[in-house]
Amino acid sequence: MSVVVGGVEYSLNNWARYEIKRRAAELESVNYYPHCEYIMPEDIVVSILGSKPNCPFLEALKRFHDFLKKRRIIFKGEYLVIPWMGAQDVADMIHHVENRINLDHLEDLAHMLKLITYHKSFDTCINQAFEHLYAFKFPDANIETHELKHIRQLEKKMYGYILRLEKLQTVLTFYIEFLLKQV
């Protein structure tokens, strides 16, 4: 499984990294992503690689194509593009989908479980990026005001990304727990 956030990719292996880069290029084209001129930096692009063609969750999403389209959620191939709308909107989307899932196919939920594991690696990548940025921009203690302001803005933006991912993770976690209790 791979996740692309604001054009930055996070994947479990080299093959997935290559695949997400190739498909992300398709997503960014106007023809492939017709409902928006470009993917916003705060959009979350989830690629469920290796999932079964008839995965109940993905099939349910297809049935609610119009509902998703109104919220600018795009389901294209193995991609689910979720513009950040807030936890409640994501929960509403899940509520519309959950009754269409075949609970007998719990193995398919393994792909959902993978969705809630990426935030840890994302956080690590952010920390490493800031370490490199500080080391490159500020080799000594003399920090210019405008550069410090730029760093603060970048920190705030990255922190916003992390909060968005954590909220989505929370919603999905409650959703999975709900499904498991129904069995």
Curated annotation (Swiss-Prot):
Keywords: Late protein. Induction: Expressed in the late phase of the viral replicative cycle. Belongs to the asfivirus S183L family. This is Uncharacterized protein S183L.
